[in-house]
Amino acid sequence: MMNKDITAQSPRSKAVQDALDGKIRGFRGLLPFLGPAFIAAIAYIDPGNFATNISAGSKYGYMLLWVILFSNIMALLIQSLSAKLGIATGKNLPEVAREEFPKPVSIGLWIQGELVIIATDLAEFIGAALGLYLLFGIPMLEASIIAAIGSFAILELQRRGYRSLEAGIAGMLFVVVIAFALQTFFAKPDAVSVMKGLFVPAFHGTDSVLLAAGILGATVMPHAIYLHSALTQRRVVGKTDAERKKIFRFEFIDILIAMLIAGAINASMLIVAAALFFKNGLFVEDLDVAFQQFGHLVSPMSAALFGIGLLVAGLSSSSVGTLSGDVIMQGFINYRIPLYVRRFITIIPPILIIASGVNPTTALVLSQVVLSFGIAFALIPLIMFTSNKRIMGSLINAKWITVVSWLIAVLIVALNVFLIVDTFR
């Protein structure tokens, strides 16, 4: 239960108050506020990102690295708005929407939110199951059941409190970091080409624009927007406007660090694909093919690192999806079901799809299409609410933030419409 657990993890601890009072500074002052952004950041390294980044790197080399950098900057702003909403109001995004919108609108938003969670779970479970299949040769159906059991184990951390969950998720994020850092080291990318790809925007034909749209469009995940506002709403509660502003400054640093890590992981996926596949004239779209090629071009260790990264990213992001679903139901319709019941219900569609024998990469693409539908329903209300002084008080967006946010929203929604049309063309 999201709110209850967050509250339980938000005592007026001496460390928090000393940091707000300025008695402790630097990293010691920041430490009590670290955590929420690391949970939200898991959404940015889900298996859908694996497929998109590897396709981009294998087909166009380092050329589209700048798109990942730009996407990360956009995500940084959007996640900061979500966190700020929770800090300013003490409510999550769906709760504010329920108060501000008519009941039929809230019910409609809840339904589309649940569809987003199902699509999210599909992507995460396929990624985790594929990781098990690639690493151990376990058939996909059995692997998906093992992945389901693993996701229940991760949720058990939440019963011990949100600090335990934050530590567990951060640990899993660290595993993915190590896996792709080693992969990048083994791939021996060209440093000059990496820097050019990061800072010199370029395209090469229509297909490169389409892949760039895929990277941008898949960057902002709707469930991460809902969840981040819940992670900050009662974790540390400011008594005054000044304290709330300080809390947001600390949380912004938390977001900056977490998104930097997530961005580095996404960039490393593309870099490794460019250094190995593009260099050897291989266009790789399927994750199982990528795994085999890592083993062939580098070593079995490189292939294993890829499989481990995919498995851990899938497991951790599936648990984050479950937490987001709890926020969506509680916020939009003020109703809850036990977290483990929700987990059980949401694993059924992915397991059925895997059992049907659908190609994993095809299923990942279709899940991203469903997620594309949900972005506007999370992003537009978020910008509306954080630009409203009645709701936000002194933490209202600066005018330039509002303008930039709307431009980003228009860009992301337009790109996702474009991707949906292209998928079914």
Curated annotation (Swiss-Prot):
GO-annotated biological processes: iron ion transmembrane transport; manganese ion transport
Compartment(s): Cell membrane
Induction: Repressed by MntR in the presence of manganese.
Keyword match Manganese: yes
Topology of this chain in the membrane: Multi-pass membrane protein
Pfam families: Nramp
Family matches, as InterPro entries: NRAMP_fam
Keyword annotations from UniProtKB, A to Z: Cell membrane, Ion transport, Manganese, Membrane, Symport, Transmembrane, Transmembrane helix, Transport
Membrane found in the keyword field: yes
Domain of life: Bacteria
Recorded GO CC terms: plasma membrane
GO molecular function: cadmium ion transmembrane transporter activity; manganese ion transmembrane transporter activity; metal ion binding; symporter activity
Spans traversing the lipid bilayer: 30-50, 61-81, 107-127, 134-154, 167-187, 209-231, 255-275, 294-314, 344-364, 365-385, 401-421
HAMAP family: NRAMP (MF_00221)
Record's function text: H(+)-stimulated, divalent metal cation uptake system. Involved in manganese uptake. Can probably also transport cadmium, cobalt, copper and zinc, but not iron. May be the predominant transporter of manganese during logarithmic phase growth.
Family: Belongs to the NRAMP family.
Protein name in the entry: Divalent metal cation transporter MntH
Source organism per UniProt: Bacillus subtilis (strain 168)
Gene giving rise to this polypeptide: mntH
